[in-house]
Amino acid sequence: CLIILTSCGGGGSSNSSETNPNGSDQDINLSTEICSNTNRDRLLKCDLKHDNRDRFYYVYAPGNLDSNESIPVLFALHGYGSSALTHLNYTNYFPIADTNNFIVVYPQGATTATLSSHWNVGGWTSKSTVKDIEFIDTIINLLKAKIQIDETRLYSSGMSNGGYMSYHLICNLSERFAAIASVTGSMTDGTYDNCSPLHPMPVLQIHGLQDFVVPYIGNSGSKSIPDVIDYWVNYNSCKLEPNQLIKYSNNFDLVIFDTYENCLNNVNVKLILHPEMDHTWPTLQEYGVSASNEIWNFVSQYDLYGFIE
């Protein structure tokens, strides 16, 4: 059954399976996944068993979806201790997806005895044994089995721990993802020191100087934001001096937009730095910056091969 049209149950899927073309040889058995309607139009909740854990994710399909065309997918990852539904509500991606014709996936992080709902990114989550890279990879394969997704245009975005996870994904699953965006996230030492992307990677970081949860200057559990930006600027062989744009926010604060250009495959690395923003997802009304719009406008420029001409 098509995930964009109706709810999917195990009984209707028989024993359909798919082998992961990226080499993990992971069998995807649709009969182990049950997708059901929610109280929101075109939003399904999909439950599955992964690594002996009960996991789930939400998937939103735009109203104008053309089932004959491949469609991009944006993963939206919540922060530590939060939930997929909470993230869904404050990111408000639905109207953007409707206008631009892409699918949004909201996975739910796992909870363990020592950690609240989280994404396993090493570092400060090192007590976790949850296989989140494989979980995201499995979701991609499950989507592929149900709908014609554009596998060259898979993107990840996230808030805080979800931003860390977006970086973790492109360091460990770069054959899947074309671009990412992090809001108030960073990279753990483990992610930073063991990062091996297979292609130039567009990266957007949105951060506030008043964020003391994930400080701009870094701490024992996080790289500083300048270190993160420098990593990707150097990895992508970008011009070292950014093209800088300064805008006034609603409170007449100066918001800095640094775009590093002339990178391999014509990708960019971008930092949006707000002097008054704390650990939050900025909106146009409150901070003069819409993270959700900035994210889609940035990532949608790229596929796995770089800038889309």
Regions found by a protein language model. Give the residues of each.
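A domain-start/cap signature at the N-terminus of enzymes
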Residues: 8-73, 85-88, 128, 154-181, ...
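Serine-hydrolase catalytic machinery in alpha/beta-hydrolase-like enzymes
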Residues: 47-155, 164-168, 172, 194, ...
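Alpha/beta-hydrolase
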Residues: 75-77, 183, 274
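Short, proline-enriched alpha-helix->beta-strand connector loops that line the catalytic pocket
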Residues: 198-203, 265-269
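Short beta-strand/loop motif that positions the catalytic acidic residue
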Residues: 205-207, 211
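Acidic catalytic loop of the alpha/beta-hydrolase fold
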Residues: 211-214, 279-281
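Conserved alpha/beta-hydrolase "acid-adjacent" motif
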Residues: 212-224
